[in-house]
């Protein structure tokens, strides 16, 4: 099989062209005989493969993409396979939640990759679809999720930032979440300006809005008033697994975990899950989630003014990020997403609030769920 390396010049310079056959060769070079391998078309930072070994062991193979100093697009932190493995271990140790076990960490021809446990279950979005978008299945699944998030938030830290391991949060020394918010906002605005997504006048308006709004609640965001907690950050319909009853069976997208104000998790749930159907279902979804959350000892006060304001600010900031990240994408599905998120951004700034149903109406094209559940 050496011709795979010779003919395709497999190296860090063209890892972006890695195929199933190349991945198979690299893995087998490390002594793992493969029965089958299939590319998983998800993931922006790694190439992932569904692997079955000759003995029937199911695994997931993750290969680092050829990007020097790979940075997390959401928070700017350093992303690596090593960090991901450390976070798997940390979350399993501290919470007992279902995350992958490491099978092996390798380097071959300058290319880094890992093999991890393939977790059981199906994507949450598939579970909801296979149950005919049942309201009861939807709500029960969110109650289960609430229990897990409560367990996760029992893990606390001293400062805010990118969670690198149990003892290291970067950047060091951020004791007020407002400073973390400002740093992330500056990073995102820099990308917006660099791609000419917004003109100078609009960039100034957006910057002024975020800085003014966060300053109004800054005194409430110190670490001694709201303890930094472990946050997944990006839970959505296609990045965690559930069993046949809707109970989470696997969390695998953990490379961007944060030590953060808990609002960072809750805005995302409103952004991607609670709003999955319509406005009427949103409140029921939120109630079901928090029933599970409280049952497991969760302490976040969703009715608190500061928490609600911070959630909305984080959501509006994410809308800005999506306006930028989808800018210029023409794939037949997301051609108009950037423009639509831009409209939502300035609507949200004008009303100083978020219409989460409109967010769902944009993203709905990907999962194809109806507006009204069964």
Label for each model-derived stretch:
Residues 10-12, 67-79, 130, 276-284, ...:
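Short, flexible/disordered intra-domain loops and linkers
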Residues 14-33, 135, 154-233, 243, ...:
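An alpha-helical support segment within catalytic cores of ATP-dependent transferases
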Residues 38-172:
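ATP-binding pocket architecture of kinase catalytic cores
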Residues 44-52, 60-61, 112, 212-264, ...:
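Active-site acidic catalytic loop and adjacent metal/ATP-binding pocket
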Residues 62-63, 103-104, 230-233, 251-253, ...:
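Short beta-strand segments
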Residues 92-95, 106, 149, 153-160, ...:
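A general structural signal marking secondary-structure boundaries and capping sites
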Residues 163-164, 323-345:
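Hydrophobic/aromatic-rich alpha-helical bundle segments in the mid-to-C-terminal region
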Residues 263-298, 312-333:
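Active-site activation/catalytic loop segments of kinase-like enzymes and analogous catalytic loops
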């Amino acid at each position: 099989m050496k011709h795979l390396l010779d003919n395709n010049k497999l190296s860090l310079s063209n890892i972006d062209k890695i195929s199933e056959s190349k991945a198979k060769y690299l893995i087998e070079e490390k002594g793992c005989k493969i029965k089958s391998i299939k590319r998983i078309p998800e993931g922006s930072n790694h190439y992932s493969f569904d692997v079955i070994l000759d003995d029937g062991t199911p695994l997931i193979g993750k290969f680092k993409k050829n990007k020097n100093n790979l940075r997390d697009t959401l928070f700017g932190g350093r992303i690596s396979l090593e960090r991901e493995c450390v976070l798997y271990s940390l979350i399993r140790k501290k919470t007992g939640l279902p995350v992958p076990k490491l099978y092996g960490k390798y380097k071959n021809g300058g290319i880094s990759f890992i093999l991890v446990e393939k977790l059981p279950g199906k994507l949450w979005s598939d579970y909801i679809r296979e149950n005919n978008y049942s309201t009861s299945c939807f709500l029960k699944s969110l109650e289960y999720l609430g229990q897990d998030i409560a367990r996760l938030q029992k893990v606390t830290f001293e400062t805010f930032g990118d969670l690198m391991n149990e003892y290291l949060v970067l950047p060091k020394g951020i004791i007020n979440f407002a400073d973390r918010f400002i740093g992330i906002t500056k990073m995102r605005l820099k990308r917006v300006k660099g791609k000419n997504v917004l003109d100078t006048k609009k960039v100034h308006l957006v910057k002024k809005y975020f800085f003014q709004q966060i300053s109004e609640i800054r005194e409430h965001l110190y670490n001694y008033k709201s303890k930094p907690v472990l946050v997944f950050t990006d839970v959505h319909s296609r990045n965690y697994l559930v069993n046949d009853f809707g109970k989470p069976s696997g969390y695998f997208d953990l490379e961007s975990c944060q030590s953060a104000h808990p609002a960072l998790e809750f805005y995302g749930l409103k952004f991607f899950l609670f709003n999955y159907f319509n406005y009427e279902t949103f409140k029921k979804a939120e109630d079901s989630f928090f029933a599970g959350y409280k049952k497991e000892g969760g302490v976040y006060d969703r009715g608190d003014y500061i928490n609600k304001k911070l959630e909305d600010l984080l959501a509006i900031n994410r809308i800005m990020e999506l306006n930028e990240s989808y800018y210029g994408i023409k794939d037949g599905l997301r051609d108009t997403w950037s423009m639509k998120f831009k409209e939502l951004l300035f609507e949200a700034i004008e009303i100083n609030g978020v219409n989460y149903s409109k967010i769902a109406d944009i993203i709905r094209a990907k999962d194809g769920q109806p507006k009204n559940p069964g």
